[in-house]
Amino acid sequence: MATLHIEHPISDLPASLGAFSRFREARRRAVVRAERVLHPVDDDKYIYVSLDFDSVEQAEAFQNFLEANVWTSREASPALAGTPRARVLTDVDSASAP
């Protein structure tokens, strides 16, 4: 499994969540297995997104899609308030709490 971890400043949380929702079908086509959207408890102008994929290649392909089609468009990402930082991560160790 691979996770595409994204973080960036936003101008408005509801607008950011709305933009995220509009790309639900793109995430489905990219075979996103799980997704999480978070923001710091003390900063509603910053957002973190984690998207899980079956492979590193799928995660990298979706990152390329975001970089080429979403983050470059004000219409597609109206709440984006800075440069997104995205990295593909893989598990090296994990466990569930008892």
Language-model-detected regions and their locations in the chain:
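Short acidic/glycine-enriched loop/turn segments that link adjacent beta-strands
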Residues: 43-46
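Short structural boundary motif marking the start of a folded domain
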Residues: 1-4
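Short, surface-exposed ligand-recognition loops at beta-strand->loop->(often short) alpha-helix junctions
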Residues: 9-19
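Short hydrophobic/aromatic beta-strand micro-patches
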Residues: 7-9, 50-52
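An amphipathic, aromatic/His-enriched active-site/gating alpha helix that lines ligand/cofactor pockets
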Residues: 18-36, 52-87
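Residues that cap or initiate secondary-structure elements
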Residues: 12-14, 55-57, 92
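Short, low-complexity Ser/Thr-rich regulatory SLiMs
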Residues: 39-41
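Short, low-order "capping/linker" segments at domain edges
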Residues: 85-98
